[in-house]
C-alpha cells in the first residue's frame, strides 16, 4: 500500500495479487479519512470491493 498526501487529501494505491492490478482512491486527510483509507486498502487486497466485480468475472468466468 502506498499513501501520498496531496492538497488535503490522501491518495492511496493498493495492488491486488490475484488480479495483477493496482487500484487507486482518494480520501480526506483527516482521522476518519485515514481510517477509511486503510479499510479500503485491506478490502482491495482481499478482492472484496464492489469495484473489483468486473475483474473477478474476467478472471473466473464460468
UniProtKB/Swiss-Prot annotation:
Q: Which InterPro entries match?
A: Kil_phage_P22-type
Domain of life the protein comes from: Viruses
Q: What does this protein do?
A: P22 kil is essential for lytic growth in the absence of abc. Expression of P22 kil causes filamentation and cell death.
Name under which the protein is recorded: Protein kil
What organism is listed for this UniProt entry? Salmonella phage P22 (Bacteriophage P22)
